[in-house]
């Protein structure tokens, strides 16, 4: 018999055995499309827009279904009711994080994003308490964001209305806020170390969103035996970790346990308090990875939202005009915006929310994992199963947001023009793994966008109707196309 035929039969048998085990050997997975050997359902899922493929599959198989990304099953949960049931009602059972081969090489199970169990719980609890103590959502961090907003405005003023690519400067502002929280101070936008750090973070985010990295995570053998952009991520990560380690050493030399200056100091003090605990999760390794996580998550997500937001606003100049009218009426031109202004600026608040809804930055959430065998609806999902919760299915729900494919701040306004909250608005996810930096990110988006539109009118280089807002090919997140604009003084 032809060796190729034998190999094909063997692989098919292995796949059938795997499917049988999941159906009868400890779990009853939801239905889904029949997978191919080795590849699973990858060929049936459009890489260009995975969330759209999941929506189509939900119409066939219902709100809970199974796909195979490679040879391992992934349960997809689609729609508000099912997502809420999983992430909120059964929050503990769905609070695990799936371990991707590439991130495992980078983080080694440490940090806050891709850790699990006791380490994740303790690191997350510490991070939330520390950020809260330093004023997340309170006055002190608002001061830092306002300071950075003023620096951002001055940097934009230096362009003198000439066309520019906003990618770097819109990344520098949120990155500097993170620096002020974990390193105590911000950097000048021309600082070479800062420029290098920004470059590595931006490059990593782009690579992580590439189809190649998705292939590497589904077929780990590619990581060790083939060249590719995944190696660039590993090299960039070494640079970022070394940079962070130098900052930690500087803090160790000047630490005053009675007067913590920033996040690093607080972590070092916690390490000292637990130095006799052999099982302590507060180690230098965990600190380095946690800081790298905070940098990556806290910089690129906010930066991309700002960049995408300005592109959408330029395509809808009537929205810019309404926001600027509200800014003029509530704030004026002689003081900086503050968070107290938000409650008196419903249209601006609605616009910020609509930007986040429309861009749908992380359409399929960061994949979770079950922490135990879970009975979910009529299925039994085995411990350790990958779970994808579709945020698209809520942010683009046509009953909650009529004409969801249209950018319209009215989605968040009631009939009287007051701001309208929506339970379907979950760009930061929900439940036990909700984004740690949600409060900070909301503050940055409101203050940065308001400060920009208070001082400038973004002007495209093409007719607004010709602006293309279609995202580039994306994996984890949706990235806007590159563009240039002019910041015309208002």
Curated annotation (Swiss-Prot):
Cross-referenced SUPFAM superfamilies: Cytochrome P450
Chief localization: endoplasmic reticulum
GO BP terms in the entry: organic acid metabolic process; xenobiotic metabolic process
Species this chain originates from: Oryctolagus cuniculus (Rabbit)
Signal peptide: none
Keyword Nucleotide-binding: no
Origin organism lineage: Eukaryota, Metazoa, Chordata, Craniata, Vertebrata
Protein's name according to its UniProt entry: Cytochrome P450 2C1
Subcellular localization: Endoplasmic reticulum membrane; Microsome membrane
Function: Cytochromes P450 are a group of heme-thiolate monooxygenases. In liver microsomes, this enzyme is involved in an NADPH-dependent electron transport pathway. It oxidizes a variety of structurally unrelated compounds, including steroids, fatty acids, and xenobiotics.
Keywords: Endoplasmic reticulum, Heme, Iron, Membrane, Metal-binding, Microsome, Monooxygenase, Oxidoreductase
InterPro entries to which the protein is assigned, alphabetical: Cyt_P450 (IPR001128), Cyt_P450_CS (IPR017972), Cyt_P450_E_grp-I (IPR002401), Cyt_P450_sf (IPR036396), Cytochrome_P450_fam2 (IPR050182)
Gene induction: By phenobarbital.
Tagged with keyword Iron: yes
Record Gene3D superfamilies: Cytochrome P450
């Amino acid at each position: 018999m032809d060796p190729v035929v034998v190999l094909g039969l063997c692989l098919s048998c292995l796949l059938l055995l795997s499917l049988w085990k999941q159906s009868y050997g400890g779990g009853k997975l939801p239905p889904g499309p029949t997978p191919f050997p080795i590849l699973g359902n990858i060929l049936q899922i459009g890489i260009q827009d995975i969330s759209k493929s999941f929506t189509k599959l939900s119409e066939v198989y219902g709100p809970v279904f199974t796909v195979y990304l490679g040879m391992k099953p992934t349960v997809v949960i689609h729609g508000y009711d099912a997502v809420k049931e999983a992430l909120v009602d059964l929050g503990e059972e769905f609070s695990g994080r799936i371990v991707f081969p590439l991130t495992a090489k980078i983080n080694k199970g440490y940090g806050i994003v891709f850790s699990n169990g006791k380490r994740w719980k303790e690191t997350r609890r510490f991070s939330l308490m520390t950020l809260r103590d330093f004023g997340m959502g309170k006055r002190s961090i608002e001061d830092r964001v306002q300071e950075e907003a003023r620096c951002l405005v001055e940097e934009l003023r230096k362009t003198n209305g000439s066309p520019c690519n906003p990618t770097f400067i819109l990344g520098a502002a949120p990155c500097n806020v993170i620096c002020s929280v974990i390193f105590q101070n911000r950097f000048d936008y021309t600082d070479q170390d800062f420029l290098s750090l920004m470059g590595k973070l931006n490059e990593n985010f782009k690579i992580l969103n590439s189809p190649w990295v998705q292939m590497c995570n589904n077929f780990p053998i590619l990581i060790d035996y083939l060249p590719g952009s995944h190696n660039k991520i590993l090299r960039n990560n070494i640079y970022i970790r070394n940079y962070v380690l130098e900052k930690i050493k500087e803090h160790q030399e000047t630490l005053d346990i009675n007067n913590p200056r920033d996040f690093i100091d607080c972590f070092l003090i916690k390490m000292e308090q637990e130095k006799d605990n052999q099982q302590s999760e507060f180690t230098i390794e965990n600190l380095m990875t946690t800081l790298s996580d905070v940098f990556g998550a806290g910089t690129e997500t906010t930066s991309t939202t700002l960049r995408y937001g300005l592109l959408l606003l330029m395509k809808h100049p009537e929205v810019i005009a309404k926001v600027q009218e509200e800014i003029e009426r509530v704030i004026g031109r002689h003081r900086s915006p503050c968070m107290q202004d938000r409650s008196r600026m419903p249209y601006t608040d609605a616009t910020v929310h609509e930007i986040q809804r429309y861009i749908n930055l992380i359409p399929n959430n960061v994949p979770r994992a079950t922490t135990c065998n879970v009975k979910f609806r009529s299925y039994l999902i085995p411990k350790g199963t990958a779970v994808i919760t579709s945020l698209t299915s809520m942010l683009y729900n046509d009953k909650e947001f009529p004409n969801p494919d249209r950018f319209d701040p009215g989605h968040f306004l009631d009939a009287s023009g007051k701001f309208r909250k929506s339970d379907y608005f979950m760009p930061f996810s929900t439940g036990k793994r909700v984004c740690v930096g949600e409060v900070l990110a909301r503050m940055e988006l409101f203050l940065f966008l308001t400060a920009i539109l208070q001082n400038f009118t973004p002007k495209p280089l093409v007719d607004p109707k010709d602006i293309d807002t279609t995202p580039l090919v994306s994996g984890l997140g949706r990235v806007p196309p590159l563009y240039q604009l002019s910041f015309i003084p208002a």
